[in-house]
Structures are given as structure tokens and as C-alpha cells.
Amino acid sequence: MATVDRWLLPDGIEEVLPPEAARIETARRRVLDLFQRWGYELVITPHVEFLESLLTGSGQDLDLRTFKVIDPLSGRQMGLRADITPQVARVDAHTLRREGPSRLCYAGSVLHAKPQALSTSRSPIQLGAELYGDASASSDLEVISLMLEMLELADVPDVHMDLGHVGIYRGLAKAAALSGEAEQRLFDALQRKAMDEIEQLTAALDPALASMLRALARLCGGRETLDDARHALAAAPAGVQAALETLATVADQLALRYPQVPLYFDLGELRGYHYHTGMVFAAFVPGVGQSIAQGGRYDDIGADFGRARPATGFSTDLKTLVGLGNADLTTPVAGIWAPYGDESGLWGAIRDLRRQGERVVQALDGQSQADAAQLGCDRQLQLSNGIWTVASLAS
């Protein structure tokens, strides 16, 4: 192996160096503190689990993004986590087993076998919050509000929200008695807004249902979209009407809480359709093609762990959040340079300063004071009249 190959990293795998690593860690602490103030408890899940647990309740996409290895102890196949959400669902359903609502949050590195989009990282730091045990619109409102508070804390500018509800399409597809294959083909056409293809796929359906399914591709835009949807879907089944009202209720409350955040609706955009069961939402900023934070309701995820619970939540990539935000994440780097040696009182003075929160760098044997500035020190610890005191580095 050539020397150059020893330090090359795989495509999409990054290391974070000073001072950026300190900025990311500061952001992580601030966001987790925010979650804690909202009542969310931190959980730390393992980097690797048996594959069945990691892929529970997820679609094929997560399977393709998961690195697989063989456990040398058990011989079973394991996966390196590509998404922390299923792990937290396992914690809620199988480990905690609480009866009432449970609020959990997390932050940790994940690894993707394949990037989610062109030029995206395969080693993001996933950060998120989940609310289990409540099926009402109030929990959807809470997690979306918390996500917006997180983006505000990071000072991400020009955020706009995209809201939808997969229950609308699910209800119409069920009423039309579409086969699994037909439902998937129509879903794909809706994502591309391929109107000719949508017309063809719905041609043999009941005219009223066909009209409503075709309307989904056109129901996108601002707040007026919901009024248009009420008219276009007036004959839809009760479940579709309920989903539309949930969407409207949450949107109204968000508009009151965050009037500065534009809301956009697209009833044909079914993000996470094979995973989510209710409201879906995502935050976007100009100039970035992918959502910067996203989430939704996924009420069936705990079933494979023996305990289905209503659930909703969101996640983001912490590195992306820091890169887009304008929050001041700098940490004081000034420090005190302490000399090398074992003079009386030196070690005690160094320990006292560190306990007071000072950053103290002690010289190594043979290291000169000339290195102090490079190490971020602007002061020095010196012996004066038998007492160790802090003075300017220039003195």
C-alpha cells in the first residue's frame, strides 16, 4: 500500500478538526439542553445491533444504506446504524415500556453505505427528538415547534416549512382498492407530478376517486392549498377528511406561534410514505436542495417490538445545522501557560486554576515558552516572591 493511501478517507467520510469540532460540540450541547428544557430525556444507543432490530419498521431504503457485518461471537448478521430512530423506538417499546407519553432525544454518529443524495455525507451526526404514546395533533404540533426552536437556536436564516399528510393519499388509495403494485406506481407518478401518467393510472377507477387522486398532484402552494383541498376532496372518505383537518389545525397553530416562518403545502409530496403514517414535515432554506430537518408521524414502528405506540419525531444532521446556522459557537481559547517542573506549589496552582474553569497548558520537558501563543495561551503562570501568580504572557 502506498503511503498516500494510508491517510485517504473513503468518499463521503469526513473527520472534523479544530476549531470546527469545538463548534459542533457546542451546538450539540446547546440543542440537547433545549430538548431537556422541553422535557425530552436523552438516550444513547449502540453503534451496532443485530440487523433485524435496526431495520424494523423501515423500508428498503434503510436496508440499502446499512453496512452489514457478521458478529464473530454469535455468527449473526449485524448492522452499523444508518438511522437512530428505530433504535429509540425499540427503547420506548421494549426497554422503557412506559404507559403514558414518553419524550426521548438523541445525538450520535450514523454511517451510510450509500449517500442519501449527491455530494452528501455518509457519516452525518444525527440529532433528533421523538414523542411516543400520543396520537393527537398536539404532539405533532409540539415536535414541529421544537424543530423550529432548534433551527432558531442555531440561527438558520430564511427557513420555510413544508407540511403534508400521507393519510390523505393512503385513504384515497384504500377507497380505490388499489393493488400494492398499482399503489406504488401511482405513488411514483405523484412524486414526479407526471400528469399524463397519473391520468392513465387512474383511468379505470371510479370517476370521483380518480378526480381526487389526480387533484393531489395540483394541490401545492401556500395556505390557500388547504381551502382548495377541502373543495377538491369534499367527497373523500372520513379518514381523508380527518387527515386534512389535522393538517389544517397544526398549520393554524404554527402560523400563530411562528408567523415569520412561511408554510408550504404539497399533498402529492409523500416523503417517507412507506414509513410514515400521518403528518410529515420538513424545513428548507434557499440554495439547499435537500431538507435540513425533517420528520413525521410513524404510529406502527413499535409493533415489531411487541408494543405498537403512536409516535412522531424529527431529525437533522448536526454538521449541516452548524454549517447553515449563524449562531456564535466559538468557545474561549485563551489559556494560561504553565512552566515545566516540580517546584513547590506549582501543581497545586495549576489544579486550582483548572477547577476555576481556566484553561491551563503545562509545558512538557524541553518545551519553550515560544510555543505558548501557538497553543492559544495569552497569559502565563509565574513564580513571584514565592507565590504562583498569573501574568500577561508578554511580561
Curated annotation (Swiss-Prot):
The keyword Isomerase does not apply. One of its GO terms (biological process) is L-histidine biosynthetic process. GO terms for cellular component: cytoplasm. Keywords: Amino-acid biosynthesis, Cytoplasm, Histidine biosynthesis. Its main location: cytoplasm. Gene3D superfamilies: Bira Bifunctional Protein, Domain 2. It is found in: Cytoplasm. Pathway: Amino-acid biosynthesis; L-histidine biosynthesis; L-histidine from 5-phospho-alpha-D-ribose 1-diphosphate: step 1/9. It comes from the Bacteria. InterPro entries: aa-tRNA-synth_II/BPL/LPL, HisRS-like_core, HisRS/HisZ, HisZ. NCBIfam families: hisZ_biosyn_reg, PRK12292.1-1, PRK12292.1-4, PRK12421.1. Required for the first step of histidine biosynthesis. May allow the feedback regulation of ATP phosphoribosyltransferase activity by histidine. Belongs to the class-II aminoacyl-tRNA synthetase family. HisZ subfamily. Heteromultimer composed of HisG and HisZ subunits. This function is generally fulfilled by the C-terminal part of HisG, which is missing in some bacteria such as this one. This is ATP phosphoribosyltransferase regulatory subunit. It comes from Stutzerimonas stutzeri (strain A1501). The lineage of its organism: Bacteria, Pseudomonadati, Pseudomonadota, Gammaproteobacteria, Pseudomonadales.
